[in-house]
Amino acid sequence: MADKVRQFTIYRIKNLDRAEQEYYRTLQRTLDKIEDDVIKLAGRELPTQAGKLIELQSAIAIRPKIRTILQTEFLGWANTVTKKGFNRQAKRIERAFKAIGNIPVEFQELTKGDLQLIRNLKLQTFTQFKDISNTFTKRLADKVYQNTLVGREFVELEKELRQTINGIYSKSDDREAQKLVSFIKANKNKKSMQSEVDKAVATLQSKFARDRAGDNMLKYSSQLLNDGLREFDAQVNAKKSFDAGLTFIKYFGDIIPTTRQICRDVLNGRYRKRKSNLFTIEEVRQLWQRQSWSGKKSGDPLVVRGGYNCRHQWTYVNPDWYDKEGNLII
């Protein structure tokens, strides 16, 4: 008998992966446009003499124009993620509940309470994207002012602005560097290409002095995209499960080389309490409280799971769905 609990949990996870990849690609295009628009704005609005920035008044006046660019492009993208992306995942959760069955029919569909939670989570995540927009509006405007104050060359300001937006993936006039950036962008999310991507990143770091871990808009946006999608799924799934009276949980997902040890151990049954590898909610919370690891995120483990960029998910079940040997029998 097919394990439909596993099947539909993996269905949720795989579609989260696809959604993240889709919106990461559109994020890249959005930030590339922001990068181009900000540089064009700076080139148009900031006077120079012998290539050096010379007028503080223009540097101050540019701030609201930078804000408009980020609000138009970035918040437009964020609105699509939190509306279209979240709605799609909510419908997948509903489909999984209907397919697994064995709970009251009224809880298999999205209820009024579920829809209210979905609206709240959309607003919460969009507000976090808005915070990123405001933060980087200030950082970009500050860089314009600071570089103008000391009369630096425009080309130096351009480099700082580009890397503040896209970090290691910012555009470059150097043909070899730009070729590496394009390759990394195209293959970053392909597991089969990770070795080649890492080599390209290493070349950018060593030969072109690019900083992979720097504070940039792409870094924070992609992190929130990942966590926002997966934590939305976790919270809506938990709400529906609690309403349906499901109080046991099981962990699902792939094990890959970068899988954290805590996730690997739970999936492999190191902390198994039952043959089915089910846990009570309290057992999971106590386990997470006792453990410490790199990338651990504060919050309820039912939501944050293994931490930043974790791609595993909990599914809520009834222990009566399993026999004494731990096999699913529904």
Protein language model features and the residues they cover:
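N-terminal leader/targeting and assembly helices and adjacent pre-domain segments
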Residues: 1-213, 299-302, 315-330
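Acidic, glycine-rich two-metal-ion catalytic cores of nucleic acid-processing enzymes
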Residues: 196, 212-323, 327-328
